[in-house]
């Protein structure tokens, strides 16, 4: 089962391009769709996020644990995502962060 990572530069707005109220979704089109990461018994890292990425959408078909960092290592004590989860995370642009994934229960 893979984890999918979609990168966004900014949040969507009620009035596109204006000063409308931010909505809890990335502004499409996303700036990058990473190759899926296979979830397994060992921690696996994503590619570094794009310099303009400020928001990532992580989706997964299976229970897993994730960790963010410049050289992250996920384990079963890290942030848990439920099966069929889709969750946004804010990241600092230009920080060269990655996400690591490992299977969980």
Predicted regions span which residues?
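Surface-exposed ligand/attachment interfaces on beta-rich extracellular proteins
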Residues: 18-52
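Short, intrinsically disordered N-terminal pre-domain segments
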Residues: 1-28, 103-105
